[in-house]
Regions:
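N-terminal secretory signal peptides that target proteins for export/translocation
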Residues: 1-9
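Conserved beta-alpha junction segments in alpha/beta enzyme cores
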Residues: 33-279, 284-288, 296-306, 319, ...
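Bacterial N-terminal signal peptides
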Residues: 11-24
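Anionic-ligand-binding alpha/beta catalytic cores of soluble enzymes and soluble regulatory domains
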Residues: 311
Length: 474
Protein backbone atom coordinates (compact mmCIF):
# COMPACT_ATOMS: atom_id res chain seq x y z
CA UNK A 1 0.00 0.00 0.00
CA UNK A 2 1.36 3.37 -0.97
CA UNK A 3 1.15 6.33 1.38
CA UNK A 4 2.07 9.94 0.74
CA UNK A 5 4.54 10.51 3.53
CA UNK A 6 4.88 14.29 3.40
CA UNK A 7 2.99 17.14 1.83
CA UNK A 8 4.40 20.19 3.52
CA UNK A 9 4.80 23.89 3.04
CA UNK A 10 7.94 25.43 1.59
CA UNK A 11 9.46 26.09 5.00
CA UNK A 12 8.92 22.50 6.11
CA UNK A 13 10.64 21.30 2.94
CA UNK A 14 13.54 23.66 3.61
CA UNK A 15 13.95 22.31 7.12
CA UNK A 16 13.98 18.75 5.84
CA UNK A 17 16.37 19.41 2.98
CA UNK A 18 19.03 21.47 4.72
CA UNK A 19 19.19 19.93 8.19
CA UNK A 20 22.38 18.02 8.84
CA UNK A 21 22.22 15.21 11.33
CA UNK A 22 24.30 14.62 14.41
CA UNK A 23 24.14 11.60 16.68
CA UNK A 24 24.17 12.45 20.37
CA UNK A 25 21.65 12.04 23.17
CA UNK A 26 18.89 14.54 23.82
CA UNK A 27 19.97 16.60 26.82
CA UNK A 28 17.83 18.45 29.32
CA UNK A 29 16.95 21.75 27.70
CA UNK A 30 14.81 24.65 28.77
CA UNK A 31 16.03 27.89 27.32
CA UNK A 32 19.50 28.36 28.77
CA UNK A 33 19.05 26.13 31.83
CA UNK A 34 21.89 23.66 32.43
CA UNK A 35 21.29 19.95 32.14
CA UNK A 36 20.01 18.20 35.25
CA UNK A 37 22.70 15.83 36.59
CA UNK A 38 21.95 12.17 36.05
CA UNK A 39 21.41 10.28 39.28
CA UNK A 40 23.16 7.00 40.00
CA UNK A 41 20.12 5.29 41.52
CA UNK A 42 18.26 2.72 39.42
CA UNK A 43 15.49 3.93 37.14
CA UNK A 44 12.04 3.11 38.51
CA UNK A 45 8.55 3.33 37.04
CA UNK A 46 5.31 3.94 38.92
CA UNK A 47 2.02 3.69 36.98
CA UNK A 48 -1.13 5.54 37.97
CA UNK A 49 -4.67 5.23 36.64
CA UNK A 50 -7.90 6.94 37.76
CA UNK A 51 -11.46 7.31 36.56
CA UNK A 52 -12.02 10.51 34.55
CA UNK A 53 -15.63 9.82 33.52
CA UNK A 54 -18.05 12.72 34.05
CA UNK A 55 -21.17 11.79 36.02
CA UNK A 56 -24.61 12.10 34.47
CA UNK A 57 -25.51 15.77 34.13
CA UNK A 58 -21.89 16.96 33.92
CA UNK A 59 -20.64 19.05 31.04
CA UNK A 60 -18.96 17.51 28.02
CA UNK A 61 -17.73 19.04 24.78
CA UNK A 62 -21.07 18.70 22.98
CA UNK A 63 -23.60 18.78 25.79
CA UNK A 64 -24.10 17.14 29.17
CA UNK A 65 -23.65 13.47 29.93
CA UNK A 66 -27.14 11.95 29.79
CA UNK A 67 -26.29 8.33 30.53
CA UNK A 68 -23.63 6.44 32.45
CA UNK A 69 -20.67 5.19 30.46
CA UNK A 70 -20.29 1.56 29.45
CA UNK A 71 -16.50 1.95 29.30
CA UNK A 72 -14.89 4.52 31.57
CA UNK A 73 -12.77 7.45 30.53
CA UNK A 74 -9.35 7.10 32.14
CA UNK A 75 -6.60 9.43 33.26
CA UNK A 76 -3.46 7.35 33.45
CA UNK A 77 0.26 7.69 33.21
CA UNK A 78 3.68 6.85 34.55
CA UNK A 79 6.31 8.44 36.77
CA UNK A 80 9.92 7.71 35.81
CA UNK A 81 12.38 8.27 38.65
CA UNK A 82 16.13 7.87 39.03
CA UNK A 83 17.35 10.05 36.14
CA UNK A 84 17.35 13.55 37.56
CA UNK A 85 14.04 14.91 38.79
CA UNK A 86 11.08 12.59 38.12
CA UNK A 87 9.40 12.62 34.70
CA UNK A 88 5.62 12.30 34.41
CA UNK A 89 3.67 11.26 31.31
CA UNK A 90 -0.12 11.46 31.46
CA UNK A 91 -2.86 10.72 28.92
CA UNK A 92 -6.53 11.48 29.55
CA UNK A 93 -9.65 10.46 27.62
CA UNK A 94 -10.94 14.02 27.19
CA UNK A 95 -11.37 16.15 24.09
CA UNK A 96 -8.83 18.66 25.38
CA UNK A 97 -7.06 20.24 28.34
CA UNK A 98 -6.19 23.81 27.48
CA UNK A 99 -4.60 26.99 28.75
CA UNK A 100 -4.71 27.40 32.56
CA UNK A 101 -6.25 23.93 32.97
CA UNK A 102 -3.20 22.43 31.29
CA UNK A 103 -0.98 24.43 33.64
CA UNK A 104 -2.97 23.24 36.66
CA UNK A 105 -2.80 19.61 35.56
CA UNK A 106 0.97 19.73 35.18
CA UNK A 107 1.41 21.59 38.45
CA UNK A 108 -0.77 19.14 40.37
CA UNK A 109 0.98 16.06 39.01
CA UNK A 110 4.42 17.64 39.45
CA UNK A 111 3.79 18.37 43.12
CA UNK A 112 2.62 14.81 43.74
CA UNK A 113 5.63 13.32 41.93
CA UNK A 114 8.19 15.64 43.54
CA UNK A 115 9.26 17.26 40.29
CA UNK A 116 8.75 20.47 38.30
CA UNK A 117 5.92 21.15 35.82
CA UNK A 118 8.50 21.42 33.03
CA UNK A 119 9.08 17.66 33.43
CA UNK A 120 5.39 16.75 33.16
CA UNK A 121 3.60 16.05 29.86
CA UNK A 122 -0.22 15.97 29.89
CA UNK A 123 -2.12 15.05 26.73
CA UNK A 124 -5.75 14.49 25.85
CA UNK A 125 -6.62 11.72 23.42
CA UNK A 126 -9.33 13.96 21.90
CA UNK A 127 -12.37 11.69 22.01
CA UNK A 128 -15.45 13.86 21.46
CA UNK A 129 -17.99 12.37 23.88
CA UNK A 130 -15.80 13.65 26.68
CA UNK A 131 -15.04 16.75 28.78
CA UNK A 132 -13.17 19.88 27.76
CA UNK A 133 -11.13 21.55 30.51
CA UNK A 134 -10.07 25.19 30.17
CA UNK A 135 -9.70 27.22 33.36
CA UNK A 136 -8.81 30.36 31.38
CA UNK A 137 -12.13 30.21 29.55
CA UNK A 138 -13.89 29.47 32.82
CA UNK A 139 -12.35 32.55 34.50
CA UNK A 140 -13.18 34.80 31.55
CA UNK A 141 -16.80 33.62 31.51
CA UNK A 142 -17.12 34.31 35.23
CA UNK A 143 -15.67 37.79 34.76
CA UNK A 144 -18.22 38.53 32.05
CA UNK A 145 -21.10 37.26 34.15
CA UNK A 146 -21.83 34.33 31.84
CA UNK A 147 -23.30 31.54 33.96
CA UNK A 148 -24.21 27.90 33.40
CA UNK A 149 -21.90 27.46 30.44
CA UNK A 150 -22.68 24.14 28.72
CA UNK A 151 -19.07 22.99 28.27
CA UNK A 152 -16.83 23.88 31.19
CA UNK A 153 -17.25 22.08 34.52
CA UNK A 154 -14.15 23.14 36.41
CA UNK A 155 -15.11 21.52 39.72
CA UNK A 156 -15.13 18.07 38.13
CA UNK A 157 -11.92 18.77 36.20
CA UNK A 158 -10.14 19.81 39.40
CA UNK A 159 -11.45 16.69 41.11
CA UNK A 160 -9.80 14.53 38.45
CA UNK A 161 -6.51 16.40 38.87
CA UNK A 162 -6.68 15.71 42.61
CA UNK A 163 -7.47 12.03 41.97
CA UNK A 164 -4.49 11.67 39.65
CA UNK A 165 -2.18 13.43 42.10
CA UNK A 166 -3.32 11.16 44.94
CA UNK A 167 -2.81 8.11 42.73
CA UNK A 168 0.75 9.21 42.01
CA UNK A 169 1.50 9.61 45.71
CA UNK A 170 0.11 6.14 46.36
CA UNK A 171 2.01 4.58 43.44
CA UNK A 172 5.49 5.97 44.09
CA UNK A 173 6.36 3.67 47.02
CA UNK A 174 5.37 0.70 44.84
CA UNK A 175 7.51 1.73 41.84
CA UNK A 176 9.27 -1.09 40.03
CA UNK A 177 12.83 -1.02 38.68
CA UNK A 178 13.18 -0.57 34.93
CA UNK A 179 15.78 -2.96 33.53
CA UNK A 180 15.05 -2.76 29.80
CA UNK A 181 13.14 -0.74 27.22
CA UNK A 182 12.31 -1.39 23.60
CA UNK A 183 10.82 0.49 20.68
CA UNK A 184 8.77 -0.83 17.78
CA UNK A 185 6.47 0.26 14.98
CA UNK A 186 3.65 -1.46 13.14
CA UNK A 187 1.62 -0.28 10.18
CA UNK A 188 -2.03 0.34 10.93
CA UNK A 189 -4.37 -1.11 8.32
CA UNK A 190 -7.32 0.95 7.09
CA UNK A 191 -7.92 3.55 9.76
CA UNK A 192 -6.25 6.85 8.88
CA UNK A 193 -6.95 9.09 5.92
CA UNK A 194 -6.27 12.77 5.37
CA UNK A 195 -9.29 14.95 6.07
CA UNK A 196 -8.26 17.67 3.64
CA UNK A 197 -8.76 16.82 -0.03
CA UNK A 198 -6.54 19.12 -2.09
CA UNK A 199 -7.04 19.64 -5.82
CA UNK A 200 -4.43 19.94 -8.61
CA UNK A 201 -4.28 23.70 -8.08
CA UNK A 202 -3.17 23.20 -4.47
CA UNK A 203 -6.46 24.43 -3.03
CA UNK A 204 -8.87 22.77 -0.62
CA UNK A 205 -11.59 20.85 -2.49
CA UNK A 206 -13.55 18.82 0.06
CA UNK A 207 -13.48 17.65 3.66
CA UNK A 208 -13.36 14.02 4.74
CA UNK A 209 -14.09 13.86 8.47
CA UNK A 210 -14.30 11.01 10.93
CA UNK A 211 -17.27 9.35 9.22
CA UNK A 212 -18.15 9.56 5.52
CA UNK A 213 -20.91 7.96 3.45
CA UNK A 214 -20.28 9.80 0.16
CA UNK A 215 -18.59 7.22 -2.07
CA UNK A 216 -16.80 9.88 -4.13
CA UNK A 217 -15.12 11.41 -1.10
CA UNK A 218 -14.37 7.97 0.31
CA UNK A 219 -12.76 7.06 -3.00
CA UNK A 220 -10.00 9.65 -2.79
CA UNK A 221 -6.59 8.22 -1.79
CA UNK A 222 -5.59 8.17 1.87
CA UNK A 223 -3.35 11.15 1.22
CA UNK A 224 -0.64 12.32 3.58
CA UNK A 225 -0.68 10.22 6.76
CA UNK A 226 1.77 8.52 9.09
CA UNK A 227 0.68 4.89 8.69
CA UNK A 228 2.73 3.65 11.64
CA UNK A 229 1.77 3.14 15.26
CA UNK A 230 4.74 3.52 17.61
CA UNK A 231 5.31 1.66 20.87
CA UNK A 232 7.81 2.29 23.66
CA UNK A 233 7.75 -0.55 26.19
CA UNK A 234 9.39 -0.62 29.62
CA UNK A 235 10.37 -3.92 31.24
CA UNK A 236 11.28 -5.03 34.74
CA UNK A 237 13.22 -8.17 34.02
CA UNK A 238 11.08 -10.21 31.64
CA UNK A 239 7.85 -8.49 32.70
CA UNK A 240 6.42 -5.64 30.63
CA UNK A 241 5.33 -2.93 33.07
CA UNK A 242 4.35 -0.08 30.73
CA UNK A 243 3.42 0.09 27.05
CA UNK A 244 3.29 3.59 25.57
CA UNK A 245 1.72 3.82 22.13
CA UNK A 246 0.93 6.67 19.75
CA UNK A 247 -0.97 6.90 16.48
CA UNK A 248 -1.91 9.97 14.44
CA UNK A 249 -5.63 10.21 13.78
CA UNK A 250 -8.75 11.79 15.18
CA UNK A 251 -9.99 9.07 17.56
CA UNK A 252 -13.71 9.08 16.72
CA UNK A 253 -15.99 6.59 15.01
CA UNK A 254 -19.21 8.41 15.97
CA UNK A 255 -20.09 10.89 18.72
CA UNK A 256 -22.62 13.39 20.10
CA UNK A 257 -24.37 10.52 21.86
CA UNK A 258 -24.47 12.10 25.32
CA UNK A 259 -22.72 9.01 26.65
CA UNK A 260 -19.09 9.46 27.78
CA UNK A 261 -16.81 7.02 26.01
CA UNK A 262 -13.18 6.49 24.97
CA UNK A 263 -14.19 5.44 21.44
CA UNK A 264 -12.13 2.97 19.41
CA UNK A 265 -8.70 3.81 20.94
CA UNK A 266 -10.11 3.09 24.40
CA UNK A 267 -11.51 -0.24 23.27
CA UNK A 268 -8.19 -1.13 21.62
CA UNK A 269 -6.34 -0.17 24.79
CA UNK A 270 -8.69 -2.39 26.82
CA UNK A 271 -8.08 -5.32 24.48
CA UNK A 272 -4.34 -4.91 24.90
CA UNK A 273 -4.72 -4.80 28.68
CA UNK A 274 -6.22 -8.28 28.41
CA UNK A 275 -3.26 -9.43 26.29
CA UNK A 276 -0.63 -8.00 28.65
CA UNK A 277 -2.21 -7.43 32.08
CA UNK A 278 1.13 -6.76 33.81
CA UNK A 279 1.57 -3.44 31.98
CA UNK A 280 -0.17 -0.10 32.13
CA UNK A 281 -1.28 0.65 28.57
CA UNK A 282 -0.82 4.34 27.89
CA UNK A 283 -2.05 5.50 24.49
CA UNK A 284 -1.51 8.94 22.95
CA UNK A 285 -2.94 10.61 19.87
CA UNK A 286 -0.18 11.74 17.53
CA UNK A 287 -0.26 14.72 15.19
CA UNK A 288 -3.71 13.91 13.84
CA UNK A 289 -5.20 17.37 13.37
CA UNK A 290 -5.76 16.76 9.65
CA UNK A 291 -6.25 12.99 9.91
CA UNK A 292 -9.40 10.93 10.58
CA UNK A 293 -10.97 7.56 9.83
CA UNK A 294 -13.43 8.88 7.22
CA UNK A 295 -12.24 6.76 4.31
CA UNK A 296 -12.84 3.61 6.36
CA UNK A 297 -15.73 4.63 8.61
CA UNK A 298 -19.45 5.21 8.02
CA UNK A 299 -20.40 5.94 11.67
CA UNK A 300 -22.22 2.64 12.09
CA UNK A 301 -21.89 1.42 15.70
CA UNK A 302 -20.46 -1.92 14.61
CA UNK A 303 -17.61 -0.20 12.79
CA UNK A 304 -16.27 1.19 16.07
CA UNK A 305 -15.31 -2.37 17.01
CA UNK A 306 -13.76 -2.91 13.56
CA UNK A 307 -11.55 0.16 13.99
CA UNK A 308 -10.65 -0.84 17.55
CA UNK A 309 -9.65 -4.32 16.41
CA UNK A 310 -7.41 -2.88 13.68
CA UNK A 311 -5.77 -0.50 16.13
CA UNK A 312 -5.27 -3.25 18.71
CA UNK A 313 -3.63 -5.42 16.05
CA UNK A 314 -1.10 -2.66 15.33
CA UNK A 315 -0.52 -2.16 19.06
CA UNK A 316 0.17 -5.87 19.31
CA UNK A 317 2.59 -5.80 16.38
CA UNK A 318 4.47 -2.76 17.66
CA UNK A 319 4.69 -4.31 21.13
CA UNK A 320 6.17 -7.48 19.64
CA UNK A 321 8.75 -5.43 17.74
CA UNK A 322 9.61 -3.45 20.88
CA UNK A 323 10.04 -6.67 22.84
CA UNK A 324 12.35 -7.99 20.14
CA UNK A 325 14.38 -4.77 20.26
CA UNK A 326 14.59 -4.30 24.03
CA UNK A 327 17.87 -3.09 25.49
CA UNK A 328 19.20 -2.58 29.02
CA UNK A 329 18.35 0.74 30.68
CA UNK A 330 20.47 2.78 33.09
CA UNK A 331 19.96 6.32 34.43
CA UNK A 332 22.22 7.56 31.64
CA UNK A 333 19.72 6.18 29.11
CA UNK A 334 16.97 8.56 30.26
CA UNK A 335 16.77 12.27 29.41
CA UNK A 336 14.27 15.10 29.23
CA UNK A 337 14.27 18.25 27.16
CA UNK A 338 11.95 21.25 27.39
CA UNK A 339 11.82 24.27 25.08
CA UNK A 340 9.31 27.06 25.78
CA UNK A 341 7.54 28.33 22.66
CA UNK A 342 5.41 31.47 22.44
CA UNK A 343 2.73 31.12 19.76
CA UNK A 344 1.13 34.37 18.66
CA UNK A 345 -2.62 34.66 18.18
CA UNK A 346 -3.48 34.87 14.50
CA UNK A 347 -4.28 38.19 12.91
CA UNK A 348 -7.86 39.27 13.42
CA UNK A 349 -8.43 37.76 16.87
CA UNK A 350 -9.41 40.93 18.71
CA UNK A 351 -10.16 40.53 22.40
CA UNK A 352 -12.96 43.09 22.57
CA UNK A 353 -14.73 41.71 19.51
CA UNK A 354 -14.43 38.14 20.76
CA UNK A 355 -15.82 39.15 24.16
CA UNK A 356 -18.86 40.69 22.45
CA UNK A 357 -19.41 37.45 20.54
CA UNK A 358 -19.19 35.42 23.74
CA UNK A 359 -21.86 37.56 25.36
CA UNK A 360 -24.11 37.59 22.32
CA UNK A 361 -23.95 34.10 20.84
CA UNK A 362 -24.88 30.73 22.35
CA UNK A 363 -22.06 28.23 22.61
CA UNK A 364 -22.43 25.49 20.00
CA UNK A 365 -19.53 23.35 21.17
CA UNK A 366 -15.84 23.21 20.38
CA UNK A 367 -14.68 25.56 18.94
CA UNK A 368 -16.48 28.79 19.85
CA UNK A 369 -15.57 32.45 20.49
CA UNK A 370 -14.75 31.70 24.14
CA UNK A 371 -12.00 29.31 23.01
CA UNK A 372 -10.48 31.92 20.73
CA UNK A 373 -10.76 34.54 23.47
CA UNK A 374 -9.05 32.30 26.02
CA UNK A 375 -6.08 31.62 23.76
CA UNK A 376 -5.82 35.21 22.52
CA UNK A 377 -5.80 36.43 26.13
CA UNK A 378 -2.91 34.12 26.97
CA UNK A 379 -1.10 35.03 23.77
CA UNK A 380 -1.33 38.73 24.62
CA UNK A 381 0.45 37.86 27.88
CA UNK A 382 3.18 36.04 25.86
CA UNK A 383 2.45 32.83 27.71
CA UNK A 384 4.90 30.10 26.67
CA UNK A 385 3.91 26.53 25.86
CA UNK A 386 6.52 23.89 26.66
CA UNK A 387 7.48 21.56 23.81
CA UNK A 388 9.20 18.60 25.44
CA UNK A 389 11.12 15.44 24.61
CA UNK A 390 11.62 12.18 26.49
CA UNK A 391 14.81 10.28 25.71
CA UNK A 392 14.99 6.54 26.33
CA UNK A 393 18.18 5.23 24.75
CA UNK A 394 17.82 5.77 21.01
CA UNK A 395 14.13 6.66 21.26
CA UNK A 396 12.74 10.21 21.35
CA UNK A 397 9.14 10.93 22.33
CA UNK A 398 8.11 14.50 21.47
CA UNK A 399 5.23 16.30 23.19
CA UNK A 400 3.43 19.00 21.19
CA UNK A 401 0.37 21.23 21.72
CA UNK A 402 -2.90 21.56 19.88
CA UNK A 403 -4.47 19.74 16.96
CA UNK A 404 -1.18 19.49 15.12
CA UNK A 405 -1.05 18.53 11.43
CA UNK A 406 0.64 15.22 10.64
CA UNK A 407 3.33 16.95 8.57
CA UNK A 408 5.04 18.02 11.80
CA UNK A 409 5.26 14.40 12.94
CA UNK A 410 6.63 13.28 9.58
CA UNK A 411 9.14 16.14 9.59
CA UNK A 412 10.35 15.14 13.06
CA UNK A 413 10.91 11.57 11.92
CA UNK A 414 12.85 12.78 8.88
CA UNK A 415 15.01 15.14 10.93
CA UNK A 416 16.60 12.21 12.78
CA UNK A 417 16.23 8.98 10.82
CA UNK A 418 19.02 7.55 12.96
CA UNK A 419 16.71 7.69 16.00
CA UNK A 420 13.32 6.21 16.81
CA UNK A 421 11.24 9.39 16.89
CA UNK A 422 7.55 9.49 17.70
CA UNK A 423 5.11 12.11 18.91
CA UNK A 424 2.14 12.87 21.14
CA UNK A 425 0.06 15.92 20.23
CA UNK A 426 -3.04 17.41 21.90
CA UNK A 427 -0.97 18.70 24.84
CA UNK A 428 -2.03 22.27 25.62
CA UNK A 429 -5.30 22.47 23.67
CA UNK A 430 -5.39 26.26 23.73
CA UNK A 431 -4.17 26.98 20.17
CA UNK A 432 -6.80 24.78 18.53
CA UNK A 433 -5.70 23.45 15.14
CA UNK A 434 -2.09 24.08 14.13
CA UNK A 435 -1.65 23.74 10.39
CA UNK A 436 1.42 23.92 8.21
CA UNK A 437 2.23 27.37 6.87
CA UNK A 438 1.06 26.26 3.42
CA UNK A 439 -2.29 25.01 4.70
CA UNK A 440 -3.49 28.47 5.68
CA UNK A 441 -3.39 29.50 2.03
CA UNK A 442 -5.22 26.37 0.89
CA UNK A 443 -8.39 26.94 2.91
CA UNK A 444 -10.57 24.40 4.68
CA UNK A 445 -12.16 23.94 8.09
CA UNK A 446 -8.99 23.30 10.09
CA UNK A 447 -7.40 26.66 9.23
CA UNK A 448 -10.45 28.89 9.66
CA UNK A 449 -10.08 31.55 12.37
CA UNK A 450 -12.87 29.78 14.27
CA UNK A 451 -10.82 26.55 14.36
CA UNK A 452 -7.17 27.61 14.44
CA UNK A 453 -6.22 30.43 16.78
CA UNK A 454 -2.67 30.63 15.44
CA UNK A 455 -1.53 31.52 11.93
CA UNK A 456 1.07 30.29 9.46
CA UNK A 457 3.75 31.89 11.63
CA UNK A 458 3.37 29.04 14.14
CA UNK A 459 5.24 26.60 11.90
CA UNK A 460 8.68 28.15 12.35
CA UNK A 461 8.87 28.22 16.17
CA UNK A 462 7.48 24.70 16.46
CA UNK A 463 9.91 23.24 13.93
CA UNK A 464 12.75 25.10 15.62
CA UNK A 465 11.75 23.62 18.99
CA UNK A 466 11.54 20.11 17.52
CA UNK A 467 14.94 20.55 15.89
CA UNK A 468 16.46 21.79 19.14
CA UNK A 469 15.08 18.86 21.13
CA UNK A 470 16.25 16.38 18.50
CA UNK A 471 19.61 18.18 18.38
CA UNK A 472 19.64 18.79 14.66
CA UNK A 473 22.57 20.94 13.57
CA UNK A 474 21.61 24.17 11.82
Amino acid sequence: MMHTRLSAGRSLWIVLSVCSLVVRPCTNLRGEEPAVPVALAPVTLAPFDVDATPPVGSAMAYGPAVKAADLQLRCRGIVLSGAGEPIVLCAIDWIGVGNAAHDAFREGLAKAAGTTPARVAVHALHQHDAPHADFTAEKLLAGMGVKDHPRFDGDFHREVIARAAAAIEEALPKAKPVTHAGFGRAEVAQIASNRRLIGPDGKFVAWRGSAVKDVTIKGWPEGTIDPDLAALVFFSGDEAIASITSYATHPMSYYRTGVPGPDFPGIARFLRSQDVPTAVHLHFTGAGGNIAAGKYNDASPSNRVVLATRLAAAMRGAFAAATQNKKPITPASIGWGSVPVVLAARDGLELEKLAEEVRGKPDRGTFAPIDALAFATRAREAHAIDVTCLTVGGTRMLHLPGELFVEYQLAARQMRPDLDVFMAAYGDYGPGYIGTAAAYGQGGYEVLPTSSFVGPEAEGPLLDAIGTLLEVSK
